[in-house]
Amino acid sequence: QPSISDQQVSALPYSDQIQQPLTNQVMPDIVMLQRRWMDRYEIDSLIGKVEQEWVAIKAFLNQAQIEVRHDTEMKYYIVHLKIVDFGSSCQLGQRIVEVLGIPPAHILDQAPKFFEKLPDGTWSLKKLHNILGVETGGPGGRFKDLILRMLDYDPKIQPYYALQHSFFKQETGIAGHPTYQFSANTGPAHYMTEGHLAMR
């Protein structure tokens, strides 16, 4: 059987599904991982899935415009490849103005989502709450409302209800899914859902 280096072994996933006491018996279909056992073919079957999830993670990072410069070692991922460390991440191009100066007007003119031209001819960067949410049906109110609810100390919005907020929904009124209505008040203590009152 081909030998496996210590470095390769340390990078392999762990499994609690197959555990056997340590013996001197040769077991060609079993790989020892720090007193734990995993079937060799189970490891082989994970290779394609791991690569697929790794590509999906990279695609997500690119879409989110987050550049990960370090801390992408396998020890920062747990099967099924959940990212557990963003310690060295930074926003893409966060120092572009300091390094290259203000972009030329013809470039700013092509990014109306992020910049607006003032009457005096200068450019201004839009507020974050006016930028986020554009793709989901309208910026501004929904994002600002959600943030204010999260910052409201008592009563603070619970994670379950935060996920139901319209900011996270691309479509509303889908059959089979509850429709949550949020009042214009930034600090309400109640939510209306499916015609009944739910306390936070």
From Swiss-Prot:
The modification Phosphothreonine is found at residue 122. The keyword Signal does not apply. The modification Phosphotyrosine is found at residues 41, 76. Its EC number is 2.7.11.23, 2.7.12.1. Inhibited by RANBP9. Its main location: nucleus. ATP binds at residue 58. The modification Phosphoserine is found at residue 88. One of its GO terms (cellular component) is cytoplasm. One of its GO terms (biological process) is protein phosphorylation. It catalyses: L-tyrosyl-[protein] + ATP = O-phospho-L-tyrosyl-[protein] + ADP + H(+); L-seryl-[protein] + ATP = O-phospho-L-seryl-[protein] + ADP + H(+); L-threonyl-[protein] + ATP = O-phospho-L-threonyl-[protein] + ADP + H(+); [DNA-directed RNA polymerase] + ATP = phospho-[DNA-directed RNA polymerase] + ADP + H(+). It is found in: Nucleus. One of its GO terms (molecular function) is RNA polymerase II CTD heptapeptide repeat kinase activity. Keywords: ATP-binding, Kinase, Nucleotide-binding, Nucleus, Phosphoprotein, Serine/threonine-protein kinase, Transcription, Transcription regulation, Transferase, Tyrosine-protein kinase. Can also autophosphorylate on serine and threonine residues (in vitro). Autophosphorylated on numerous tyrosine residues. Interacts with RAD54L2/ARIP4. Interacts with CRY2. Interacts with RANBP9. Interacts with WDR68. Interacts with SIRT1. The polyhistidine repeats act as targeting signals to nuclear speckles. The histidine-rich domain (HRD) region is intrinsically disordered and promotes the formation of phase-separated liquid droplets that enhance its ability to phosphorylate the CTD (C-terminal domain) of the large subunit of RNA polymerase II (RNA Pol II). Belongs to the protein kinase superfamily. CMGC Ser/Thr protein kinase family. MNB/DYRK subfamily. Dual-specificity kinase which possesses both serine/threonine and tyrosine kinase activities. Plays an important role in double-strand breaks (DSBs) repair following DNA damage. Mechanistically, phosphorylates RNF169 and increases its ability to block accumulation of TP53BP1 at the DSB sites thereby promoting homologous recombination repair (HRR). This is Dual specificity tyrosine-phosphorylation-regulated kinase 1A. It comes from Oryctolagus cuniculus. The lineage of its organism: Eukaryota, Metazoa, Chordata, Craniata, Vertebrata.
